[in-house]
A protein has these predicted regions:
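Structural signal for interior beta-strand "rungs" in well-ordered beta-sheet cores
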Residues: 3-189
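Terminal amphipathic alpha-helical/low-complexity segments used for targeting or macromolecular assembly
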Residues: 1-8, 13-14, 19-20, 56, ...
Length: 278
């Protein structure tokens, strides 16, 4: 089915628009843009040069996709934003393209970006992540699959967040947050394994215990991170999730967060139960 493009939208004839899209009035789409099938672009959205968008995406009022990077190193490079399928990009979200020639900001599939979220240049995001209201992700970050950011989280540049992690509202962090955990506070700290979300992701009880044991060695032991990793290899049964933890810890360049007090950890655990239902 042919796409429906409002005559009040400003869509470049050079832009490539897929089938069965709906583009509302006052949308602005530049020349070097590709949009897949079955996308809905609501009024007052701007989609800028270098944007490559898959199918089934919804972009809401006031969002800017493919904005020039807010980086002093940007000198007009031919860079991109690459977006997968079935993402929801809500009102006033900004996604910057890469800084250097060929650079890419990447958003995978089935992600939900709430109002006012900002994804900066060259950040790579996996699938099924949630970004709460006003969350700000700085440049060159790497974010795994199934990560939940609560409201107004600020992630500093070149940090990483592992799969199925959850981050408390209002948290600002500049160190890596490993997979399968709850984290939050100021400064950000470890609050325990993210058991509710792991269970929702069909990770069995035995594996969840292995994850908990691995992080007990990392966050409750009296050894260095290097020694804790070796203890995980020696003491925790192997499996995909444990290997994911080991690889994440071994490749951390910014360092990882530390342990949180029990009272705050209890609050974050209750938040995790809430998000597992959405």
């Amino acid at each position: 089915m042919a796409s429906i493009i409002s005559p009040k939208a400003e869509v470049s004839p050079k832009a490539k628009i897929g089938d069965n899209c709906k583009i509302y009035p006052f949308v602005y789409i530049e020349d070097d843009v590709e949009i897949g099938d079955n996308c809905v672009i609501y009024p007052f959205v701007s989609i800028m040069n270098g944007t490559r968008m898959g199918s089934g995406n919804k972009v809401f009022q006031g969002a800017v996709v493919g904005a020039l990077p807010q980086d002093f190193n940007f000198k007009g490079a031919n860079s991109f934003v690459v977006i997968g399928d079935n993402n929801t990009i809500r009102e006033n979200v900004v996604i910057n393209r890469g800084t250097y020639d060929g650079g890419k900001t990447v958003l995978g599939n089935n992600n939900f970006l709430m109002e006012g979220a900002h994804i900066s240049h060259d950040t790579v995001i996996g699938n099924r992540c949630v970004f709460g209201y006003g969350t700000k992700i700085a440049g060159d970050c790497v974010i795994g699959n199934g990560v939940i950011y609560s409201t107004s989280v600020v992630e500093n540049a070149k940090t990483r967040v592992g799969d199925l992690a959850m981050i408390q509202a209002g948290t600002t962090f500049s160190k890596d947050i490993p997979p399968y955990i709850i984290a939050g506070g100021k400064p950000v700290k470890y609050a325990g394994p993210n058991n509710i979300i792991m269970e929702a992701a069909n990770i069995g009880e035995k594996v969840r215990k292995h994850v908990a044991n691995a992080y007990r060695l990392v966050f409750h032991g009296q050894t260095s991170l290097f020694d804790a990793i070796n203890q995980i290899k020696d003491q925790v049964p192997d499996g995909a999730e444990v290997q994911n933890i080991i690889h994440f810890l071994e490749t951390s360049e910014k360092g990882v967060i530390t342990k949180m007090k029990d009272a705050v950890a209890s609050i974050l655990s209750r938040q995790s139960k809430f998000f597992s239902k959405i």
